UniProtKB/Swiss-Prot annotation:
Coiled coil: none
Gene Ontology biological process terms from the UniProt entry: cell redox homeostasis
Listed InterPro entries: BrxB/BrxA
Record-given protein name: Bacilliredoxin SH1478
Gene3D superfamilies for this protein: Glutaredoxin
Sequence similarity: Belongs to the bacilliredoxin family.
UniProt source species: Staphylococcus haemolyticus (strain JCSC1435)
Amino acid sequence: MNPYEQYMQELAQQMRAELTENGFESLETSEDVSNYMKNVNEEDTTFVVINSTCGCAAGLARPAAVAVAEQNDKKPTNKITVFAGQDKEATQTMREYIQQVPSSPSYALFKGTELKHFIPREHIEGRDIQDICMDIKDAFDENC
């Protein structure tokens, strides 16, 4: 592994921990994603965070996801994450389930394997964190 790859891996580990330390399951391989989606209960809701190393993920996407997932009255059954740019195959497989234009960071909310709500990067970047939290809250309130 070259120094750049090592640096990015170490950086990503900290960014991944922001979610996993708050109850998100990290799916790091294509098989992890496929197995999860094949075995999810059709009545369960799953909140997916497509993580990223960009500034809007650090300052907006991860903090908003954690805050709403912890504090909202209605919560998804499951919380998972894949890391764009780091876990490329896992991210690609998740995007096949999402079936939207690739976007990171982004959020997806599923009921079973059916996509119920998607929030792309363009609805995260440059916005106020409270507005992002309200978007997530509204999706949870409607679908969880």
